[in-house]
A protein has these predicted regions:
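A detector of single, family-specific signature residues
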Residues: 1-319
Length: 319
């Protein structure tokens, strides 16, 4: 409990406290820091000796963390926890994502049930499935699907309410989201998630570091002359990574605006291959993350064809 921790750690002068990341670490860290202590939250992905040990207990884990922390704290891969206010705002985005997944499952079930009866629903967007007249569904399925359509209507209304809250947060509290939204295909949800996940652009010395932070760079396991191609690490925030992938699909799709990002992705698509499209989408998502951080950090105006125009000017003959 908070009060018990506060009473216990008040007895010490400034000390280094090392804890493992978990459900409680987001509030334990600021609590102990408020008492003047140095708090490091260990990243389990960086401590294989800890979670892959054959002899594992709380006491053994604590001893291992203490030894590593005394030797070199950087080996812990310390995790940066967001502020409580940022976590509360991120909860709105996570609630929306959960509602969207629930709606998708319900819609897929409804469409699948109708197809199994030899019928087919008319084409409509996912948010409008609940608006279809009940008479368009097979009569035998109407008693089973009616409550699902009611649930879909309620979920869609809740998603719209979340969208209103997100738009309000972008407008009133996080005006810096206007910088990422300059990019065609990046909306309020992605922009707010990007700003809240990174929290401050100064955390990264170089914009290129953002791609690795979000798990959009390939894993590496080279040895000697052997350097196999591996999938991306998928480290970092899964929700933001998913949103960036969705934005990349839009940028490369039929409605994407002509830009350096789109041209880069199209060149990768031309290479072909079984995984050509996946690689192109991932590469565009990675470049998009770098671009969004640069726009946010520098406060620059977005130029869709900036690199292309630079190359054209460089090729022009000198007067």
């Amino acid at each position: 409990r908070k009060e018990s921790l506060r009473l216990y750690f008040r007895r010490f002068t400034r000390i280094r406290v090392i804890c493992e990341v978990g459900t409680f670490s987001p509030w334990v860290k600021p609590l102990l820091e408020s008492l003047g202590h140095e708090v490091l939250v260990a990243n389990p992905r960086k401590l294989r000796a800890l979670y892959a040990s054959g002899h594992k207990s709380d006491r053994i884990d604590a001893r291992m963390l203490a030894r590593v922390g005394r030797m070199d704290p950087a080996l812990l891969g310390p995790i940066h926890h967001r502020s409580l206010a940022t976590q509360a705002d991120l909860a709105v985005l996570r609630a929306r994502a959960l509602l969207v997944r629930a709606r998708t499952k319900l819609v897929n079930h409804v469409r699948g049930a109708v197809k199994s009866m030899g019928a087919r629903l008319r084409t409509c967007s996912t948010p409008r499935v609940h608006q279809l007249p009940l008479e368009e569904f097979p009569e035998a399925l109407r008693p089973a699907l009616a409550p699902l359509l009611t649930a879909l209507a309620s979920i869609t209304a809740q998603i719209q309410e979340c969208d209103r809250k997100i738009a309000e947060l972008c407008r009133d509290r996080y005006i810096e989201t206007a910088l990422p939204m300059q990019v065609h295909g990046v909306g309020p949800v992605t922009a707010l998630c990007f700003v809240l996940t990174l929290e401050t652009p100064e955390r990264f010395k170089k914009s290129r570091m953002v791609g690795a932070y979000l798990g959009l760079t390939p894993r590496q396991h080279s040895s000697g002359e052997r350097d196999p191609q591996l999938p991306i690490t998928k480290a970092g925030d899964r929700m933001l990574r998913t949103l960036l992938i969705q934005c990349a699909h839009y940028i490369l799709g039929p409605f994407g605006q002509d830009s350096d990002l789109r041209r880069f992705g199209k060149r990768m698509l031309q290479r072909g291959g079984k995984t050509g499209k996946k690689k192109a989408v991932t590469a565009v998502a990675r470049k998009l993350a770098v671009l969004l951080h640069r726009l946010w950090f520098a406060g620059e105006e977005y130029e869709p064809l900036r690199s292309t125009r630079k190359q054209e000017r460089a090729l022009q003959p000198c007067a």
